[in-house]
């Protein structure tokens, strides 16, 4: 997938799910399933419910995404 095809949105983590998946509510009100990107996983950044995050989504599947940044 090319970098320009990615949709970036901000949201809030609602719940943690098994297999490092998270339920995220986007700013526009939609809820999606998101997994953690490799850079966040390598640096052992903890993501907890209530955290504000940036999510990358593919235009082909708008129900899933990848968490790329956790705001402090």
UniProtKB/Swiss-Prot annotation:
Organism, as annotated: Staphylococcus aureus (strain NCTC 8325 / PS 47)
Functional description taken from the UniProt entry: One of the essential components for the initiation of protein synthesis. Stabilizes the binding of IF-2 and IF-3 on the 30S subunit to which N-formylmethionyl-tRNA(fMet) subsequently binds. Helps modulate mRNA selection, yielding the 30S pre-initiation complex (PIC). Upon addition of the 50S ribosomal subunit IF-1, IF-2 and IF-3 are released leaving the mature 70S translation initiation complex.
Protein's cellular compartments: Cytoplasm
Gene coding for it: infA
Protein name: Translation initiation factor IF-1
Domain S1-like: 1-72
Family (UniProt): Belongs to the IF-1 family.
Alphabetized HAMAP family for the sequence: IF_1
Disulfide bonds: none
Superkingdom, natural source: Bacteria
Gene Ontology CC, one term: cytosol
